[in-house]
A protein has these predicted regions:
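Hydrophobic alpha-helical segments, chiefly the membrane-spanning helices
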Residues: 1-360
Length: 360
């Protein structure tokens, strides 16, 4: 893989974006509300893009050190790119738990759209099929199918609880214990899938004869750790800034009388900024398998990383009193929360079928 030591554009993105965020943070009293919010949003996105480039450099180095192929390295980078999204969602969940949950589920559709669009640019053979890495066909497609079952099953359970007034909270919603159990189970699926990915598919799929000058030696572990720490730390800063922008956006739309689903749709796009940055940056550096892994991970990691972490955060916020509940139900069961779960089924099934067909 190339590019781990080339260019300092990521530093300029982090520095410039951080400066814009600082303006929005410390000069907000002297600026119009919309301008301060725009500084937080745009500056935060720039920082997120820079942090993703730093994390790509880190996983590239790890891949060279331990012999990972580009797809596995890209999957690990995709996992790291969830950090700004989770930071942003944490602020939204604390302020508006119901909206935060809806935004989390809607990011699945944004990710599915990005994966579908990016897959359309992949080269195809005479039969019209694209060459897909074995890990995508055998691991990611299993996650797509499992996610379809999770969304359908959870949505139906919520529907039945509400219809029959069942459960500890009379069908009004899911409690702390429910969120812990569901979130923990979903997160365990991702842990197992990641271990299987590294165990079965981390090596090169095909050996290629090296032609030309000898490859550059891999970076030191200290350099790898430095890129990783910078990427993670700045992704938290960027996610925090985008989260502040999201709060202003939700409040403004609510004050203007727009339905909350409009704000949720817009927030789902901003929540996916880290994954988009990873895809664009990897593709621009001609790391196509890394970009494909990031695009696929943006879909498969929503139900098994982002959603369970959001559920666990809701449980923790409720237990610590940050979220107040009258009946003990933390996540309400209503039309919107149930429908976003049930509507997660179609894109998962479509992607599972599409990947299976191209992987034959």
């Amino acid at each position: 893989m190339a590019g781990s030591g080339e260019g300092r554009g990521w530093l300029y993105k982090i520095g410039g974006g951080g400066a814009v965020v600082a303006v929005g943070t410390f000069a907000h009293a002297a600026l119009p509300t919309w301008l301060a919010a725009a500084c937080m949003g745009l500056g935060g996105l720039a920082v997120v893009f820079g942090s993703c480039e730093a994390m790509i450099k880190s996983v590239e180095g790890i891949g060279k050190r331990v012999g990972w192929n580009p797809f596995v390295a890209g999957t690990m980078a995709g996992l790291a790119s969830n950090v700004p999204e989770l930071v942003m969602l944490g602020f939204v969940l604390a302020a508006a738990p119901r909206v935060g949950f809806i935004v989390t589920c809607l990011t699945l559709h944004v990710g599915a759209l990005a994966f579908g669009l990016y897959s359309g640019f992949l080269p195809r053979d005479a039969t019209g099929h694209a060459r897909l890495p074995d890990a995508l066909v055998k691991i990611s497609s299993d996650l797509f199918a499992a996610a379809a079952g999770v969304f359908l099953g959870t949505g139906l359970i919520m529907l039945m609880l509400r219809a029959f007034g069942a459960g500890d909270h009379g069908g009004e919603g899911l409690g702390v214990a429910d969120l812990y159990v569901l979130g923990g189970a979903l997160l365990f699926v991702q842990v197992v899938a990641t271990l299987e990915l590294v165990k079965r598919f981390s090596g090169s799929e095909e050996e290629e004869a090296h032609v030309g000058p000898p490859p550059e030696p891999p970076p030191s572990w200290a350099t790898i750790a430095g890129f990783g720490l910078i990427g993670l730390a700045t992704s938290v800063l960027g996610g925090h800034a985008v989260g502040d922008f999201a709060d202003v956006l939700v409040e403004s739309l609510d004050a203007a009388g727009y339905p909350e689903m409009v704000g949720a749709l817009l927030l789902s796009v901003f929540a996916s900024a880290g994954a988009f940055a990873m895809i664009v940056t990897s593709h621009r550096q001609k790391l196509y398998d890394v970009a494909l892994a990031s695009a696929a991970g943006q879909v498969s990691q929503v139900p098994f990383v982002v959603l369970p972490v959001a559920l666990l955060l809701l449980a923790v916020l409720a237990q610590t009193g940050i979220i107040t509940t009258s009946s003990g139900a933390v996540l309400p069961i209503d039309l919107e929360t149930t429908s976003v779960m049930l509507l997660g089924l179609p894109p998962m099934l479509l992607l599972w079928k599409a990947v299976q067909d191209d992987g034959q």
